[in-house]
Amino acid sequence: MADHKAMETIFKDNGCSDFKWMDPGEVIVSAWVRFKCMFGCKEFGRAVACPPNLPDLDECRKLFTEYSEAVLFHFEGELDDPEDRHAWTKGINDSLLAIERAAFLAGYYKAIAIYVDPCNICGECVPDKKDCRNPTEARPSPEGLGVDVFGTVRKLGYNIDVLTDYDQKMNRYGMLLIE
């Protein structure tokens, strides 16, 4: 079991103050989520950390069983320009990566971050892993792993709704798997 107090200091030091510890077995992995990636996301097949470049759903489910704890991070934002969301989420993903690194250096060698959205560490992604400019920083999103974010976060008491307009408040969620 992770030292919650020490890890929570790391989370807060990296600007992530809204989080909940959870049992990774509570993460809902569903086929419909991957289907939505395939037929609804412009990143499908265009990004190293997106399907079909990710493991199949059975392996994704198995991944969550190999950890004793997970942390769900909540980020809330309202932006004037819809295009600003890319810079906003890149900053969040950078923080999640820093948390993963700090957890690793604290002895949690299995720690892995899951980004809030498709990996945008370098801005313009490539579809082939051998061409990835930042392979040690690339991470999938929950949806890329088949995670039903709506169902999972609601189980923990967080709010999430389908947004109908870009001027609505966004709720984004990332994760840290830790052992």
What are the residue ranges of the model-derived segments?
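TRNA-binding/sensing appendages of the translation machinery
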Residues: M1-M22
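Catalytic cores of enzyme domains
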Residues: D18-A47, P51-E179
